[in-house]
């Protein structure tokens, strides 16, 4: 039995990807997306239709006076939901959809954006139990999650690097947290100059283990989903964690690796540990956060990274929109041109009706039957014409 099969027996495996084909391959229970993953998927040929249709619909719904910025802003949210809906057709569990990282320090705006995303899922017939709203684990983000959870909107608190963040999330009644294992390791390697950390000594592994044991010791229902892995050694050390979100490359490596996988995290063992409970309020949170150099740096870095990823997606969609609008302009011009030459309105331009040069007519008359149809003109100009037929 390979390691992936064994891991599934003790941990919920989540696919960290927006690539629908990869999700179909590894059949995870849950999946998570973010702007970086959606940007990557949006540039893959097989997903172009989703992107283009989302932009067209956003443009149509906002009306002719809408700016490209307004269209793209609406399309970003709709695209996240569109990919989420596609993913939910494949997986049996939940999909995580991210709130704009630029709202990470604005509780009210985060709540509003989350409600908008959930309303889009519900309009598509998907219940709240199948969606997690992903929010950065700032104090403001945690407060937003507390409000949303009371409304039945489940949250995934991400960019979690410090123990204080985990405690605050648990006390807020958050559904799930995503501590970033690999990014913690990255920070310590850079800080210490140490090239390698064996699995049990990996600072990210140690952090998640501490959080998991604390939650299980005190009976918090908040789920722990380890994220951002650098190697399968980290995954092996966290076998038994509630959930692990893993990239397709590492899923493939686990699938290709055999050997015994021992459970490392166990609620029964956690219950026997001598752990002191921490009282958490805003002052304590901010004091602990300021004292935790790694968590402070990585949270800010993560928010900036998520913001940059979102801006990259917006730029990509603006380019897509410009292409679509260019095609629409060309199509409109071609339709006008056809109507100018179709003098009797029968949907066919004969050589007698054609007022241009013979060379152009001959180029458009691909089958040389002496007639130019809308299809002929569309093919000649690189567009598709859908003309109303004359009565």
From Swiss-Prot:
A single cellular component GO annotation: cytoplasm
Top-level enzyme category: transferase
GO molecular function: calcium ion binding; transaldolase activity
UniProt binding sites for Ca(2+) 1: 342, 344, 346, 353
Compartment list: Cytoplasm
Positions of Ca(2+) 2 binding: 365, 367, 369, 371, 376
GO biological process, one term: pentose-phosphate shunt
Residue intervals of the EF-hand domain: 329-364, 365-387
Cited SUPFAM superfamilies: Aldolase, EF-hand
PANTHER family attached to this UniProt entry: TRANSALDOLASE
Protein name per Swiss-Prot or TrEMBL: Transaldolase
Gene name of this polypeptide: tal
């Amino acid at each position: 039995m390979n390691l992936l099969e064994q891991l599934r027996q003790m941990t919920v495996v989540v696919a960290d990807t927006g690539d629908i084909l990869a999700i179909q391959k590894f059949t995870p229970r849950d999946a998570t997306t973010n702007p970086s993953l959606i940007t990557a998927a949006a540039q893959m040929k097989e997903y172009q239709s989703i992107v283009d249709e989302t932009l067209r619909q956003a443009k149509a719904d906002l009306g002719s006076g809408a700016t490209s910025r307004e269209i793209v802003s609406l399309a970003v949210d709709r695209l996240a939901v569109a990919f989420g809906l596609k993913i939910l057709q494949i997986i049996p569990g939940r999909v995580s959809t991210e709130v704009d990282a630029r709202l990470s320090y604005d509780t009210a705006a985060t709540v509003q954006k989350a409600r908008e995303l959930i309303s889009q899922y519900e309009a598509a017939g998907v219940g709240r139990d199948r969606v997690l709203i992903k929010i950065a684990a700032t104090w403001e983000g945690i407060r937003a999650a507390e409000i949303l959870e009371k409304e039945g909107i489940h949250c995934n608190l991400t960019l979690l690097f410090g123990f204080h963040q985990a405690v605050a999330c648990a006390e807020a009644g958050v559904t799930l947290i995503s501590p970033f294992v690999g990014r913690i390791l990255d920070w310590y390697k850079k800080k210490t100059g140490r090239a390698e950390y064996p699995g049990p000594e990996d600072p990210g592994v140690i952090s998640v283990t501490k959080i998991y044991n604390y939650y299980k010791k005190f009976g918090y229902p908040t789920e722990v989903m380890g994220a951002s892995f650098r190697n399968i050694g980290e995954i092996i050390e966290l076998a038994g964690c509630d959930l692990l979100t893993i990239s397709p490359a590492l899923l493939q490596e686990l699938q290709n690796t055999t050997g015994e996988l021992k459970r490392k995290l166990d609620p029964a063992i956690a219950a026997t540990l001598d752990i002191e409970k921490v009282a958490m309020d805003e002052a304590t949170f901010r004091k602990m956060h300021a004292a935790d150099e790694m968590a402070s740096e990585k949270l800010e870095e993560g928010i900036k990274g998520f913001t940059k990823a979102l801006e990259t997606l917006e730029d990509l969609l603006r380019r897509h929109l410009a292409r679509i609008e260019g095609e629409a302009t060309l199509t409109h011009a071609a339709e006008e041109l056809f109507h100018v030459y179709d003098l009797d309105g029968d949907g066919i331009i004969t050589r007698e009706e054609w007022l241009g040069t013979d060379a152009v007519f001959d180029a458009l008359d691909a089958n040389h039957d002496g007639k130019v149809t809308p299809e002929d003109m569309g093919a000649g100009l690189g567009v598709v014409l859908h003309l109303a037929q004359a009565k």
